Amino acid sequence: MGVRTAYMPVLNTDEFMEGKTVEYVKLANGVEIPKIGYGVFQISKDDAPRCVREAIETGYRHIDTAQSYFNEAEVGQGIKDSGIDRKDLFLTTKIWISNYGYENTLRSVDVSLKKLGTDYLDLVLLHQPFSDTYGAWRALEKLYKDGVIRAIGVSNFYPDRLADMVAFNEIAPMVDQVETNPLNQQIEARKNMVKRGVAQEAWAPFGEGMQNMFSNPTLAKIGEVHGKSVAQVILRWLTQRDIVALPKSTHKERMEENLNIFDFRLSDSEMTTIAGLDTKTSMFFRHDTPEAVDRFVGYVKERAGRE
């Protein structure tokens, strides 16, 4: 079970818009994901339609949302307002814990489809490694086989949990989205993903600016060499490692900056220098402790009934 060929990174020079190119990661099933996506975590219902529309106008062709972000309908409105052809957009959502379980997950995907205004999704992830992940996964397998979802995966699954999901399911996860940034580089997790043919996505690529990420002198010095910002250096570092990055901004000029990273490459020595920044520690919290379970039980209660 769960045996298939590994994903492979590919370079695609098709233009998003004049002067912009993008690189892709090809999943085990052949589906290609743009290496830069627009993340909408913590973007309000009021701002989401404008932000998504502006991101698409800027050139993003990959949008990442989640049921627990409570902005799927507004993301759908932004997509509609942009006028983009649905086939030209890679759209991801994630299943929240309270929607786990076979029937619950099937129903929740149907709700997400309606909110997003689409009849299919490019990628659906299990958002957290808790509760009935196996029932939820079998629902995603069914929807994948039915053609409702083009690719399926997980988020925040540590190496042992990912190995378990790969080994004991008919269809192995194609993606694992985890916190990845210069201070928490996920080296061991990455090795495990590559071994098992799972592509990596990075949430919080800037660590939400904590620990003075944007003024880090090492990253700033590298940026000066290339005429790029610290944010652009981080995103290039991720994409050169064939990791899909999901930056977020509500400002159009920052959206443009975050997308404009494929016109330079970091040298091997620069990549090695950045590797030296790794603390091997989450900038937020771990997901594999009893306290983490308690935290997410609290989140489920807190978010119950919200739309």
Positions of predicted regions on the chain:
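Acidic-and-aromatic substrate-binding clefts and catalytic sites of carbohydrate-active enzymes
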Residues: 43-46, 65-74, 98-103, 129-134, ...
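N-terminal binding-site loop/beta-alpha segment at the start of enzyme catalytic domains
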Residues: 4-89, 206, 302-307
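A short, structured active-site edge motif that brings together acidic residues
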Residues: 86-99, 122-129, 156
